[in-house]
Structures are given as C-alpha cells and as structure tokens.
C-alpha cells in the first residue's frame, strides 16, 4: 500500500504523485556559486541588512498589485477594501548602508535557466507571491505559465526559463497516515524528494507547530520509536528543524544549490509587545513601530532556528527577517484578508508589503554571490 503524506492544507501526496512531481524537477546544473554562510552578506559588504528602521518613501510600493492577476485573495488587502494606503509607503533602511533597489530584469537574467523553490507554509506562499509579482511587473506582458498541482505550484517566466516554485510542506518533516491516525514524524523527511534539483532553496517553518484543536493536522508525534499525544511545541520544532538540517548537510552540494532559511515571521496579536496595551491585535494599525528596537524582544522560535543553524556543516544563509517584520504591526491583512471581518489575520502580510523587503534582501544576497 502506498504511503500517504499530508501537507498542512490537507492535500495528500501518494508515492505516485511524488513520482510525477519529481519529473517536473528536471535537474539543471547551475553555475558554480560561492558558498554562503549563516552570517551571509554582512561579512562581504560590511553591512547588516537586518538592522535598521522603516522610513517613509513616496516612490513605494515597488509594484501595483492590481497588475498581478495571480495574487491570492488573502494577501490582496487593497482589493479587499483596506481604506488606508500609508502602510504601502515605507521602505526598510539598514543602519549602515542602503538596500539595493530591486531590479527584476537583472534578477531574471542572473537566474536564467534556474529553478528557485520555496518550501514551507503559507508564509512561504506569501513570499513566493511577492516575488512573482515583483518580477512580473518588472517585465510587463512577458509570457508566463502558472501551474498548480496538489501542494506544488510552478510559476515560470518562459522567455528566461526561470521557474519560481512553491512546495507546501509546513513542518518540513512528514505527516503520515497510520492506523492510529495522522502522525507527525520528527525524524522523517521523505518530502525532500521534491526539493532535489532546485538551484536555490528557501525554507520556512514555524506557525503550524503551534496549532491545536481543529487546525492541528496531526494526531500523534513520533520521535524514534515512541509516540506522543503532544509535547512542548518549541522542543518539537527544534527536533524537526534538526532533521531538516541533517538532510541539508547530507544531500546539498553548495557548489550547485544555494540554501536559505526564512527567519521566523512574527504575528501581532498583543499590543503590549509594541507598547500599546490597549491594542488587542493588528486591526487599525496604520504605521510601523518607528526606531530600530522592538519592545516585545526576541522571538522564541528565532532562538531555536539559530541553535539549529549554528550546528550545521553546510552553508545556509539566514534571511533574518524577524526583527524588521516585528516593527511592521501595520502590515497585516487584519480584516482585509480572505476571511474578512470573521477572521482576523495578523500573521500573513498584505501585498504589496513586508515580504517585498524579504525578497529585496534575497536579491541583494544572490547578487553578491
């Protein structure tokens, strides 16, 4: 009997489906790249892109979302009726330098013939959609294909033969259907078969580790030969990330594949975190937290990510977007997401918006290596 692997959104991948997806991932030998490390570009340029503050810039946003028909409803805040636009006008200013302005044509030329894959949860979807729109509006009217199949989405700029891929695998490790129910296997990473062959990999995982009740997509957690009804979620997260890290160390050739980890994307559900205790969530927030410090302090999952990356042998670049995103309490859909007033969304980000900055940093880093 074929194993059935569950993605976070309920899609089922059988072994047969994996075989189909593997056919899609034709391995293209990339140009040799200088290996990246966890500190990344800061060592090369003397600039830390992740320390700075948000400043008003009337030339922003970088693109008009209405020009991108493929943007998901949940991120399209203006189309969903958000009345304010000031949140669109802020750019990230690193403390010691300027972040290069995004050049979509240059990005496509540099990555011609390449496959860039985002792997993770709906925050990966958020960043993937941001990058597709940033690129598409840089080369308007260019031909593209947008293929969706189960948990894999492939957006290809046909003129450049650049494929932006998204694989929805929220935990990075496997959830497998067994007789006792759905099992989150902290030591198993069979989904990695889909990732092989990509030239650039951008991983993300966090938010789904916290879900309980009806939103929890597993019934048991397995570590080794032991099954648990539950365990400390931060501990489980670190164990799952460690399995992912071992896969990278054992399977990635840094001369052919560049690996990034998208830092933990924060939510804004408690105004005390930004010195507004009267605010119960992100609704009606119209400006960032100004300055370069966030009173809520470091994110606990961020510490786990750093612990895991510090033990890795192969180079991984940390897109350390947590703090710069913590300052953007105004950037979420709130009631202008897919659920409207029935579903407060202070986890995802409006597009155009904060994920565009994540991709600017991704572009700057790739350009320097």
Language-model region placement:
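A compositional signature for long Ser/Thr(±Pro)-rich, low-complexity
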Residues: 2-369
